[in-house]
């Protein structure tokens, strides 16, 4: 069977299924005729033999062959139908539900990232989408610096958030946008108390510049578009007050998430980030001195799955709608301890003011355990005496 390259993948699958079912039907007819002829010839030979001693055995054999013949005539269609249905379900699962590792070459999807490429997490996210064959547009304040090397990178383009010409060209070149990733600065060092000017500059360059750019993009969206907001919320959830910049950033992202949920043209989700690790070093929350989750498994693949679920086949979109309870549950947790800190009293375990880190907690639990064991040992020795 020759595959037609111009047909849609769904048409090719149904053509393949029709071809397979038709060939299976022809083959089953030939097998049925051959079995019937064999049974008739064997029955004829048995009936022609005049052996009184084996007359009872011959009658039993003829009954068995007759039963097999009737069974083949009645149930061959059922078996063929079950086989064809199983094959269609398997092909449907591989086509509509199972995600390929990369975007198929025939598909072209555009992702817009609002963030600074100097941040290691943002830079790794951009390169992961690029490796998965997405066309990536990056809206960053340092666009002029990266545009000098734009010719050396296919499918990666840069937009200056303050340049109207860049946005005009973007609206012309990109008629359909798959997803928007709102990524403020995600990797911080302990900031402590900083001046108002430094805090204002940091918040403006990390959030408000991209917030203004997003407001200018929303009126040009022709359909409901996915918006994923990244929130460095671990510091705020742990009540670490000496990380003021990160806490304020997390609070602003929470507020913007609630605001954008009211927009009809946006399908908004937020990702609360835990500890992520690039290579052998943690890339964020370094003050906790803990190993993080691998960024490829903990962040890159979930983001890729979210994009494909919102822009894939209708069955995949339906499955995503069911798993998120109709879009009601739109908060995702990526990275180590990201979901754990949402539990009550989780901050007491990590908070420096209570002087309870994981190592100290483990040491205290070990002491309590040893004291309990020693108590029971003493009581047992006294009872034996």
From Swiss-Prot:
The answer on whether this UniProt entry bears the keyword Nucleotide-binding reads no
| One Pfam family recorded for the sequence | DUF1776
Q: Where is the signal peptide?
A: none
List the InterPro entries hit by this protein, alphabetically: DUF1776_fun
Membrane disposition:
Peripheral membrane protein
Q: Where in the cell is it found?
A: Mitochondrion outer membrane
The answer to keyword Mitochondrion applying to this record is yes
Q: Which domain of life is it from?
A: Eukaryota
Keywords from the UniProt entry: Membrane, Mitochondrion, Mitochondrion outer membrane
GO cellular component terms, alphabetically, are:
mitochondrial outer membrane; mitochondrion
**Which family does the entry's similarity section mention?**
Belongs to the UPF0744 family.
Q: What is this protein called in UniProt? A: UPF0744 protein YSC83
Source organism per UniProt:
Saccharomyces cerevisiae (strain ATCC 204508 / S288c)
Gene behind the chain: YSC83
């Amino acid at each position: 069977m020759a595959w037609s390259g111009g047909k849609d993948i769904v048409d090719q699958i149904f053509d393949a299924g029709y071809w397979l079912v038709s060939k299976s039907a022809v083959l089953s007819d030939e097998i049925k005729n051959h079995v019937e002829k064999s049974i008739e010839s064997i029955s004829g030979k048995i009936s022609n033999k005049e052996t009184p001693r084996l007359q009872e055995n011959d009658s039993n054999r003829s009954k068995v062959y007759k039963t097999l013949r009737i069974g083949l005539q009645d149930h061959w269609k059922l078996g063929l139908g079950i086989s064809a249905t199983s094959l269609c379900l398997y092909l449907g699962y591989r086509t509509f539900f199972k995600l390929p590792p990369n975007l198929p070459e025939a598909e072209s999807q555009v992702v817009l990232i609002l963030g600074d490429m100097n941040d290691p997490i943002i830079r790794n996210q951009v390169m992961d989408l690029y490796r998965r064959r997405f066309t990536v547009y990056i809206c960053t304040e340092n666009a002029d610096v990266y545009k000098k090397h734009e010719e050396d990178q296919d499918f990666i383009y840069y937009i200056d958030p303050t340049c109207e010409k860049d946005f005009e060209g973007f609206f012309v070149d990109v008629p359909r946008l798959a997803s928007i990733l709102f990524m403020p600065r995600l990797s911080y060092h302990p900031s402590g108390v900083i001046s108002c000017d430094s805090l204002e500059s940091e918040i403006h360059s990390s959030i408000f510049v991209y917030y203004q750019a997003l407001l200018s993009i929303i009126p040009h969206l022709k359909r409901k578009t996915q918006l994923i907001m990244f929130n460095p919320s671990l510091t705020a959830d742990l009540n670490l007050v000496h990380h003021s910049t990160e806490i304020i950033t997390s609070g602003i992202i929470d507020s913007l998430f609630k605001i954008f949920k009211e927009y009809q043209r946006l399908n908004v989700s937020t990702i609360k980030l835990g500890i992520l690790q690039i290579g052998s070093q943690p890339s964020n929350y370094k003050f906790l001195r803990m190993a993080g989750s691998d960024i490829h498994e903990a962040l890159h693949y979930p983001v890729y799955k979210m994009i494909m679920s919102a822009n894939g086949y209708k069955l995949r979109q339906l499955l995503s709608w069911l798993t998120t309870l109709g879009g009601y549950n739109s908060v995702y947790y990526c990275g180590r301890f990201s979901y754990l800190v949402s539990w009550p009293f989780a901050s007491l375990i990590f908070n420096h003011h209570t002087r309870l880190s994981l190592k100290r907690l483990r040491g205290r639990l070990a002491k309590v355990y040893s004291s309990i064991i020693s108590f029971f040992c003493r009581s047992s020795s006294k009872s034996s005496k």
